[in-house]
Amino acid sequence: VRLDAVYRRDPDIVFRKISGECILVPIRRRVGDLDNIYTLNETAARIWELIDGRRTLAEIRDALAAEFAVPVQEAERDLLEYLAALRACAAVKEGPA
């Protein structure tokens, strides 16, 4: 994964905050997709918000490091780990919005 890459969210997955929890919900027409609702921690929720089809992964990493007051290496590790999970469930794709 290149840090100069840009990712965009799948428009068929929506982000919701319900009772203090952040979740991703597929809105595709297949009923089986409803079994795939994902609960996000605070960092993962912020990464989802920052993946907008305009920011590079490096820009997202730097924003996370600043917002959560963590070392850049830790922010990068968290970003790449969550990005791998998002790619595995096809919630994001590489390329501009």
Regions found by a protein language model. Give the residues of each.
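Long, charge-rich, low-complexity alpha-helical segments
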Residues: 30-97
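Long, low-complexity, charged/polar intrinsically disordered regions in eukaryotic proteins
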Residues: 1-31
